[in-house]
């Protein structure tokens, strides 16, 4: 079952991206390196509820 999640920048705490993930294959929280337009840099984005 795929669920929609939000990714939050770890530097400035802005929620920049939404994506989907399969909870069966990825039971933990996602961490992706994405571009943050507020920081003007690539930063780690963590999954939030």
Swiss-Prot record:
Keywords: Ribonucleoprotein, Ribosomal protein. InterPro entries: Ribosomal_bL33, Ribosomal_bL33_CS, Ribosomal_bL33_sf, Ribosomal_zn-bd. GO terms for cellular component: cytoplasm; ribonucleoprotein complex; ribosome. It comes from the Bacteria. Pfam families: Ribosomal_L33 (PF00471). NCBIfam families: PRK00504.1 (NF001764), PRK00595.1 (NF001860), rpmG_bact (TIGR01023). PANTHER family: 50S RIBOSOMAL PROTEIN L33, CHLOROPLASTIC, LARGE RIBOSOMAL SUBUNIT PROTEIN BL33C. Belongs to the bacterial ribosomal protein bL33 family. This is Large ribosomal subunit protein bL33.
